[in-house]
Regions:
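Amphipathic, interface-forming alpha-helical segments with heptad-repeat character
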Residues: 85-100
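Surface-exposed interaction regions that form or flank ligand-binding interfaces
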Residues: 1-66, 73-78, 87-89, 103-201
């Protein structure tokens, strides 16, 4: 004990500095890992569309706006995606106000995301004109649905199967979705909620 208490100030400063550096390196590694996972996830999702928008705000028609995690341009039209990264067993249904997540001893609920998805689809439809607009709530592979998936909900791994990327366009003519998609692009703006819900590794 005496040896520790008698250490010179310079030694204490070096110890403190090493601790700060260690904490900083640990934080940087976690940040880098999370960023790498996020980038891989975004790449997997956006690969489904021929074009995409990520983390944008769309006008709601009443002076405000909705945050959109993803909007994909597909051969079927535009697809609004609400990304959910939760771990554990998810119990949800079309008529339930709240969905429950059970992860070992941990249990929590979140508001049924279907109604907010409908609002976002309607907002994009108001801009897209004749372009069909669909929506899905996408869960990462960390989630499981023991009692089945609710309506408009799918797992990330099945996204490409549900929306196969086929070369669009009318043979010998322009793609009828070019103008509606450009209208969507022109109407949205970057969202301040970008990265607000980090994706865990």
């Amino acid at each position: 004990v005496d040896l520790v208490t008698n250490l010179p100030p310079l030694t204490w400063a070096l110890v403190a500095g090493a601790a700060v550096v260690g904490w900083g390196l640990s934080w940087l590694w976690r940040w880098y890992r999370q960023r790498r996972v996020r980038r891989a996830l975004v790449t997997a999702i956006t690969a489904v569309g021929s074009d995409h928008l990520v983390d944008v705000l769309v006008p709601d028609g009443m002076g405000s706006s909705f945050h959109l995690d993803f909007v994909l341009r597909t051969p079927r039209g535009a697809v609004v995606l609400d990304l959910r990264d939760v771990r554990g067993n998810v119990f949800g249904g079309d008529q339930m106000n709240e969905w429950t997540v059970m992860d070992g001893p941990h249990r929590y609920t979140f508001v049924n995301p279907q109604s907010s998805l409908y609002d976002r689809i309607a907002a994009v439809k108001a801009i897209a004109g004749d372009m069909p607009v669909e929506g899905r709530i996408v869960f990462t592979r960390r989630a499981r649905f023991p009692k089945g998936l609710p309506k408009w909900t799918l797992m990330l791994d099945s996204l490409a199967r549900d929306f196969p990327l086929i070369e669009g366009g009318t043979p010998g003519g322009p793609d009828p979705y070019d103008l509606p998609w450009q209208n969507i692009r022109n109407a949205v703006r970057p969202s301040l909620m970008a990265q607000a819900r980090p994706v865990s590794g």
